[in-house]
Swiss-Prot record:
Keywords: Conjugation, Plasmid, Signal. Pfam families: DUF2749. This is Conjugal transfer protein TrbK. Residues 61-75 have a biased composition (Basic and acidic residues). It comes from Rhizobium radiobacter.
């Protein structure tokens, strides 16, 4: 085998090992060590998400929006 082929195979092996390690790291999220101070993040429940969405996008239901101010161009 030529030295060029050996170098290419070695680089491919390093890239494959690195990508496998990164894929494993992303797939298997490591748990924080006990007592490390890293708090586990809890995802909000669907009820909390719905309440937040209604509060953010809800608007004022008592406000009259018909016949509002005329929009005029600035130029």
């Amino acid at each position: 085998m030529s030295s060029r082929l050996i170098v290419i195979l070695a680089l491919l092996a390093v890239v494959a090992a690195a990508s496998a390690g990164i894929g494993t790291w992303i797939t298997v999220q490591p748990e924080p060590a006990s007592g490390s101070g890293a708090a586990a993040t809890d995802t909000p429940s669907s009820e909390e998400r719905r309440r937040h969405r209604d509060q953010f996008f809800g608007g004022d239901s008592n406000r009259e929006i018909r016949g509002g101010q005329e929009m005029k161009p600035r130029w």
